[in-house]
Amino acid sequence: MANKIYRGVIPPVVVPDTEDRKLDVASFERNINRMIEAGVDGLFFLGSSGEVVFSTDERRDEVVREAVRIVDHRVPVFVGIIDTETERVLEHGRRAQELGADVLVATCPFYALGGLAEVEEHFRILHEELDLPIFAYDIPVCVHTKLPWKLLAKLGAEGVLAGVKDSSGDDISFRYLCQENE
């Protein structure tokens, strides 16, 4: 796929809260350090486990800022920039870049979707307008669109995508995607 090749274990990070629904920074730091000490190859913040869709913009910023501070360049920081449409995703992507993310992770647009041509255009726009590698997040249970492996392979071969986080549960398509990228 594009530029640097990311391999290995890149787990999603749960974002802990205090009793009053604030970020529990001490627990967050312990969890991050534990995973890095265990040998992970990167960490994914603000995905489904990080409750990105339930987070305000301020909360997203706080999570990314603290994650970048705690990780301190020991492993790549992957940040979910998930939202309903391309312009909002771009805003999240620009902010994550400013805060020090290494890789951006985006689903296709959801809620109002015109089809696969729009999905392809979405990822092309992200690639053109953001300065970090982009991973496509294939999670049809949440966004109601399955990203076709042929489209993902094409965008990867063209350098639009640096990788895929596959949470589709479709192991056959995943195998085809892997074979295409060997």
Per-region residue spans from a language model:
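Active-site beta->alpha loop and helix N-cap motifs at the rims of alpha/beta catalytic domains
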Residues: 2-146, 152-154
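Catalytic alpha/beta core domains of metabolic enzymes, predominantly
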Residues: 128-129, 140-182
